[in-house]
Regions:
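Short acidic low-complexity segments
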Residues: 32-43
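N-terminal beta1-alpha1 ligand-phosphate binding loop
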Residues: 2-27
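FMN-binding flavodoxin-like domain, especially the glycine-rich phosphate-binding loop
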Residues: 25-32, 47-48, 55-170
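Compositionally biased, disordered extreme N-termini, encompassing classical targeting presequences
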Residues: 1-2, 75
Length: 170
């Protein structure tokens, strides 16, 4: 059986959860899931999928480093990239063509993923430290999002994740 890889960068864990959900729909290959920071032997995979979350408007530096370091092997494989961010909760910003973070990312890198996905993430106010909690609350207030810091808000559209996964034909 062929092997596929999903490697991810996450701050609070939602991108890992989405990666695991994508792997559940694999019927043509076995899927390994590793953090992007792991030292991964990419050559043994037929397909490489990268998932990355946004925090304060940016992907983590490890995402850019991974892509730069591995662009040749990424280009030689079936590949995909998906972005996880809370702005994608808005219908006008939840596609690869309309999501500002994904658009900016693709302009900054040389790699051109063959498949793209954008998924809304999750806000876990009770889990956050004081500074993060109130910085995110302020951002949510500005963007007319939820601001009750006693609650968790999951915006991920799991049917959209399933559709993306099935289109990858893993």
């Amino acid at each position: 059986m062929e092997k596929s890889l999903i490697t991810y960068s996450t701050v609070d864990g939602q991108t890992k959860i989405i990666s695991e959900k994508i792997a559940q729909f694999a019927t043509q290959s076995s899927v390994d899931i590793f953090p992007i920071s792991d030292n991964i032997e990419l050559g043994k995979y037929k397909t490489i999928i990268i998932g990355a979350s946004i925090r304060y408007g940016k992907y983590r530096k490890e995402v850019y480093s991974f892509v730069e370091k591995n662009i040749e092997i990424l280009d030689s494989k079936e590949n995909a990239f998906f972005s996880v961010n809370v702005v994608a909760r808005k219908s006008e910003k939840n596609t690869p063509e309309t999501n500002p973070y994904l658009i900016k990312f693709l302009k900054k890198i040389k790699w051109k993923p063959k498949n793209l996905g954008v998924f809304a993430g999750k806000i876990e106010y009770p889990k956050y430290k004081f500074v993060d909690k109130y910085a995110i609350k302020f951002i949510m207030w500005i963007t007319k999002g939820p601001t009750d810091t006693s609650k968790t808000y999951e915006f991920t559209d799991w049917k959209k994740v399933e559709s993306f996964a099935k289109n990858l034909n893993l």
